[in-house]
Amino acid sequence: MKLRGILSLMAAFAAAAGLVSGAAADPVADFYRGKTVTVVVAAGPGGAHTKYTQLLAPFLKKYMPGNPDFVTQNMGGAGGTRAANYLYNTAPQDGTAIGILLSDTALASRLEATGVKYVADKFQFLGGADQPLSAFILFKSEGIASIDDAKKKEIVLGSTGKGSQTYTVPTMINAMLGTKFKVITGYQGMGGVYLAMDRREVFGFQGVWESVKFLRPQWLANNEIAVIAAVSLKPLPDLPKVPLVQNMVSNPVDKQAVELMGGNAILGRGWLAPPGVPAERVAALRNAFQKSFNDPEAKAGAEKRKMSWDNATWQEMQEQAGRIVKADDAVIKRMRDALGLH
């Protein structure tokens, strides 16, 4: 009888331990343990998006339940559309594939740009490490110091593709203000555009000003470039006298269109998950991203590399994508007409 009692007591303890273990189990950690999460970067390996991904990857591993590895997969092409289409339609929907897309991803969806096969606000945003402001950045050697100068003389700009702001913004500004920007597409990521500028194949671009400062500091040191106009809702912090394009247009519909373009900064380094990833895994990814951004070592790494560090919450990004998808039809028609999307 004593032996039977001891065995019963042991069984009770084992059952209790099992209940405690079950209660403490983390299905998200269990899923991610031993796995690799692929971060699809909608740009080439030489650009700022890749730099941010590489900086944050070890911190995401640290804070994500199960501590999976995070690896970068560059998927430039079509101005970010290729990567967005992949994440929306082809990538695993289990949380082992996430992405960092371009600021124009949402707008390209609303414009129904060529090749777009996704709906922007269906993505599940995770957060952003920067809110990059855009501008027209040109070599001074071309003698164009203002938008007015660009109305009188053609200048060749580089672009990653027709779905990217490097193409859409100058093309729309040509239609709205009469500038003569000639845009050459097809470069693999902004790294490709920078190389084309180094070789003097092109003489400028419309894109993120902050990226120039840490990817081509020699242009600044040698006083080679001019920033002639900003395409943003607020002035460039370090160049507050650079005029805003939105203040140059008088037509109300054009003004709304420019503001729609300029408001995309919050999506500029936007991390997101495909639409089918389960909610509990998305929540864990969002939490890990925010903890990674707040980590003092991550911030120090950004400062060392002279990278801007300006958080956008996933809620702000989700709301902005929703606003773009619901943008006024008249404004979208004007933008489509300017881009020749008939």
Model-found features: residue ranges?
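Sec/Tat signal peptide C-region and signal peptidase I cleavage site
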Residues: 19-25
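An extracytoplasmic/periplasmic, membrane-proximal ligand-sensing/linker region
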Residues: 33-37, 221-224, 276-342
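Short beta-strand->loop
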Residues: 121-129, 180-186, 216-264, 313, ...
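Hinge/capping helix and adjacent helix->loop/strand transition within the periplasmic-binding protein
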Residues: 37, 62-67, 86-97, 105-199, ...
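A ligand-binding cleft/hinge motif common to bilobed small-molecule-binding domains
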Residues: 103-115, 167-176, 204-248
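Bacterial N-terminal signal peptides
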Residues: 8-18
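Extracytoplasmic "Venus flytrap"
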Residues: 38-53, 76-79, 158-165
